[in-house]
């Protein structure tokens, strides 16, 4: 029985980690399809970071007026969800288009990873319902497993915060690009590339915070669903076992 407790607790911890990974991947992938990131939020961030006082100044800094940028933003956001999008959009040059295709491929992989993580977490919830069905202290075992999973996530979060404080967002952001992309297309020139003028570092910092918040919300929703799955399936299994014991 003690071995079954250990297995059930370990599976509960793994379920928490999978749910969190799925939530983070899903939140980042979803944010990439938000047109406001490339449109209104872009212009607001450029205005604030450059200390501009009018939309005309923002237009001059970016090289696109609000209407043209909104149209471009809609096309970029739509393309992030389509494997066949080539991003041959005005006024983007060939390097910018190629980089957007790279980003799109990454976002699609993150979306797929999110679905896989959620599917595995749901499957584990069913397995946990089965392995924990005969445990006398099932709830305590599950809580300990969940606490272990949350503890692991907290440790990773604290490590990331420490890295951000020690290295800075810019260095970590550049390192992530070097890790995720096999080319240097992400290195852009403000003189020739509109994307870098549209999307300064501050925009990515805010987007990262938004993605983290979105991941927390999605994690909470998925967690509630997983609890419901385990409770429903576990209840059915325990009732079946009780009937067998009576027979």
What is the predicted function of each stretch?
Residues 59-81:
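Short, non-transmembrane cytosolic segments of multipass membrane proteins
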Residues 53-64, 87-95, 152-169:
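Hydrophobic alpha-helical transmembrane segments
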